[in-house]
A protein has these predicted regions:
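Serine/proline-rich low-complexity intrinsically disordered segments, especially terminal tails, linkers
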Residues: 6-9, 48, 300, 831
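Generic hydrophobic/packing signal
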Residues: 14, 89-95, 104, 111-114, ...
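Short, intrinsically disordered, charge-balanced linker/junction segments flanking boundaries
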Residues: 17-21, 810
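Membrane-embedded helix-loop-helix hairpins and adjacent transmembrane boundary segments
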Residues: 349-831
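Bacterial N-terminal signal peptides
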Residues: 8-18
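Residue-level detector of alpha-helical hydrophobic segments embedded in or interacting with membranes
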Residues: 11, 26-29, 133-136, 153-154, ...
Length: 831
């Protein structure tokens, strides 16, 4: 008995985490619509705190007892704060079975019908305080009801429906209206490949507009219409047109549906057609429509049951409401409506760490701090603190360069990007290998043959102090932002899948990285990087093996599935500079990678920590050699994750950020202890980037700024300053990251980072001007750097040039404008 208990405890400690099988959504009832009989086909609008329900239709007497359908014009407003309904301004006339498209402050209502006819009217309704504001928009080209509509970007799309109550054929038409246009007008777009339909499911996800199921109308023997229930489904994107996706497992006619996150589409119930033709015979004994909730996942192209809802409403609209989805009234069985209103919110579904995971996390992070304490004894001078006494082995320097560039963002994001797309970005990683050649042959000699500590000392020697200080300031400001981001983004991913508090994650990473960097300087940074690279790549390899082991068909099955789904696509053979064409990827990323490898103090500083230039070159070549290996592992892992979750879509957690997919797999599938170690390694990857930034920024501030204005300061004083700066910078970065996680400052922060990102190309352009020209001078170089930022800002905003080419634009503009300006101004200052 004791042995059995110990066995169960052991299994609890080591087995992979499993998410419980509870329904994904938790439902609660809101006050019922004051319309006692309920309504089908109402128009709805909401702003997150209030809900407007207008129009609709119902039967005062059951149709199976001879009753006729009644259209209504009454409207009701629900106040979430008061938790009560009040009467609102009625519609101009009875109306139902139109489409309601949610916008931020209300909705757009499209088409609809009454007892006599269908309508083409389109109106925008806004909830402004206690007032309802109606604005007419251009009417549809044709009257329509029983259709569907969504907003994708700034464009409203309308699909299907029928022209009149007695139509025996459904529309196979697709209309679009750009609501942001100064003079909006409807245009007809190519329709989906399948038949026309009424009452389809239609939802917009990140990758396009989805149209699924519905019912095709066919003439019957009496001259009326009968229905054929459909399960086909399609995706539309303005740039790619229509593509067929996986059929729904059953018909979803008239089902309310909503997007959940950017990749999941939830369908609540719907008429599956199983009792449609039996409805007259069943009459009041009809059991109602299905309660089943289905989840379509766009990345894996799979449908998954997600439990049941407490309602069976059809012909109503699901609208986003606060952090959930709201379903107001609807038809719960043929001829019968329900006034019930339900709000669904996500149940807690995060995986949780087990005891061994916490042990692994604590041991790993403790070891990193121990490294800092160990090397603190050797950091007695600023040369030790900034350059490790120039005694770093070449292989350690190479691993550290690799670890600095492979941030936790990359470690998490690369598999996630491949998981969600294909292998086109393979060449992005391999282009770093190309960048190694000019770095070693052309740049490294200039950095090594003068005994410098800061990379920007070269600019002082080649140009003047103003150029040096401009470059140093640009680097420092950019790194301050980067430090906060490399703490914040991984913390989000880790928190969502492990349950670790996001603020605690940020604090742990920020405090520990600051501690060991302040203690051990660059030597602690380099050796912790070495450990982290080994653990990260080893952990990624283990995760890949586990994923392949759990795949039906193993490695061969993976490649068969991936090839069939075009997930292994690598090359885009086109000259189009707006796409990820082969030449765009290679040429663009050659220049993008030249920016950090030639002008980033955090990277250049590693070149200066080895004994000789030859050893520094060997470190750079080692970094380049590691990239194909790590790229193959991470890209294969991304594809394996896609195949794994395609086979087990029920293991996905809807609504989680795409970048959480790898941490989710770690937490779910790896044994206890192993999962903890790899999650710790993700923490450590953040810390690896942070520690490099802390030390390099402290170096730049001390060497470029403090020494210039306090040249007589003793080395001991400068060392104390460097350690103090490290602590202060760590506190600032951690504080900014905590603010990002606590307050809604995202848009402001994004804007500031975008502005700082404009300076990177100009920074690399300054070094290129200094190394490859003789006549470039300080004033011309600064003009080129400033021009680079403005030109790149214009390119980003006013053109469709692919982002991979931004580095080329930035460096090229600085070089060309800087050289031309040098020929026109202060020619005597050229070197």
């Amino acid at each position: 008995m004791v042995a059995s208990a110990l066995c169960r405890l052991f299994l609890l400690l080591i087995l992979p985490l499993a998410l419980n099988a509870q329904d994904f959504l938790e439902w609660r009832s809101l006050p019922s619509l004051p319309e006692p009989l309920g309504v089908a086909g109402p128009f709805v609008a909401g702003d997150g705190s209030r809900l407007l329900v207008a129009g609709g239709a119902h039967f005062e007497v059951s149709p199976f007892l001879g009753g006729t359908k009644q259209w209504i014009s009454r409207a009701w407003l629900y106040d979430g704060e008061q938790d009560a309904w009040t009467a609102a301004e009625s519609l101009p006339g009875p109306r139902a079975y139109g489409a309601s498209v949610a916008i931020s402050d209300g909705a757009i209502w499209i088409g609809g019908s009454d007892a006599e006819r269908h309508y083409a009217a389109v109106v925008r309704v806004r909830l402004d305080g206690q007032e309802l504001i109606y604005e007419d928009l251009p009417p549809l080209p044709e009257p329509v009801a029983n259709h569907a509509a969504v907003l994708f970007g700034s464009t409203v799309y309308v699909a299907g429906g029928q022209a009149a109550p007695d139509s025996t054929e459904a529309y196979r038409r697709f209309w679009a209206l750009d609501v942001d246009d100064d003079s909006p007008r409807w245009r007809e777009v190519e329709a989906w490949p399948g038949p026309g339909r009424i009452l389809p499911v239609m939802v917009a996800l990140d990758d396009g507009v989805y149209v699924a199921s519905g019912a095709e109308l066919l003439p019957d023997a009496e001259g009326g219409a009968t229905r054929r229930f459909l399960t086909d489904a399609y995706r539309y994107h303005p740039d790619a047109g229509w593509n067929a996706v996986a059929d729904s497992p059953r018909p979803l006619v008239a089902a309310p549906a909503t997007a959940w996150g950017g990749e999941h589409l939830f369908v609540f119930g719907g008429d599956d057609g199983s009792l449609f033709f039996d409805a007259p015979a069943l009459g009041e004994d009809h059991p109602g429509f299905t309660h089943e909730v289905l989840d379509y996942h766009s990345v894996t192209d799979t449908w998954t049951p997600r439990g049941e809802s407490p309602f069976s409403h059809v012909t109503t609209t699901a609208i986003p409401w606060q952090d959930g989805v709201l379903i107001a009234s609807g038809e719960d069985r043929p001829g019968h409506r329900s006034p019930a209103v339900f709000l669904g919110t996500a149940a807690s579904r995060s995986a949780r760490f087990r005891p061994l995971d916490y042990v692994a996390l604590v041991v790993y992070l403790g070891a990193l701090v121990g490294i800092g304490f160990y090397f603190s004894r050797g950091s007695a001078t600023t040369e030790d603190f900034f350059l490790a006494g120039r005694r770093t082995p070449w292989w350690a320097a190479g691993l550290s360069i690799y670890g600095t560039q492979l941030s936790s963002i990359s470690f998490i994001a690369i598999p996630a990007k491949v998981y969600s797309t294909d292998w086109v970005n393979l060449l992005v990683q391999l282009s770093i290998v190309l960048a190694a050649f000019p770095v070693v042959w052309l740049y490294l000699p200039h950095f090594r043959r003068t005994k410098m500590t800061s990379a920007y000392e070269y600019l002082d020697t080649r140009f003047n102090a103003s150029v040096r200080l401009f470059a140093s300031a640009s680097f420092v400001l950019f790194q301050l932002g980067r430090m906060a981001i490399v703490l914040y983004l991984p913390a989000i991913a880790l928190s969502t899948v492990t349950g670790i508090d996001i603020l605690a994650a940020i604090l742990v990473m920020g405090v520990l990285a600051t501690l060991y960097t302040a203690l051990g300087g660059i030597e602690a940074v380099i050796w912790t990087d070495v450990v982290q690279v080994v653990v990260l790549l080893g952990g990624a390899a283990v995760a890949l093996i586990v994923a392949l082991w759990n795949l039906d068909g193993g490695v061969s099955g993976l490649f068969v599935q991936a090839a069939a789904a075009e997930k292994l696509h690598v090359f885009n053979w086109t000259w189009d500079y707006t796409t990820a064409a082969v030449w765009v990827v290679l040429v663009g990323n050659l220049f993008n990678n030249l920016i950090p490898y030639t002008s980033d103090q955090a990277v250049v500083q590693r070149y200066l920590t080895t004994r000789t230039e030859k050893e520094a070159a060997r470190g750079i070549w080692l970094n380049a050699a590691l990239l194909p290996v790590s790229t193959l592992i991470l890209f294969s892992l991304g594809t394996a994750l896609w195949a794994f979750y395609r086979q087990q879509p029920e293991s996905l957690i809807p609504g989680q950020p795409m970048d959480s997919i790898f941490p989710l797999f770690i937490a779910q599938q790896l044994p206890a202890g192993v999962a903890g170690a790899l999650i710790a390694a993700v923490f450590a990857a953040s810390m690896s980037t942070l520690d490099s930034s802390l030390n390099s920024v402290a170096t730049a501030l001390t060497k470029d700024w403090y020494e210039r204005f306090r040249p007589a300061a003793s080395d001991a004083r400068k060392l104390r300053l460097a350690r103090g700066l490290t602590v202060g910078l760590g506190a600032v970065a951690t504080g900014i990251s905590l603010s990002l996680a606590t307050f809604d400052v995202g848009s402001l922060w994004d804007t500031s980072q975008a502005v700082m990102g404009l300076l990177g190309g100009g920074l690399a352009g300054l070094f290129a001007l200094g190394i490859f020209t003789r006549r470039a001078n300080a004033r011309g170089a600064l003009i080129g750097a400033v021009a680079s930022a403005f030109v790149l800002a214009w390119v980003q905003r006013a053109t469709e040039v692919h982002l991979f080419l931004y580095g080329l634009v930035g460096i090229g503009t600085c070089f060309v404008v800087g050289y031309a300006a040098s020929l026109l101004v202060s020619p005597k200052s050229a070197h």
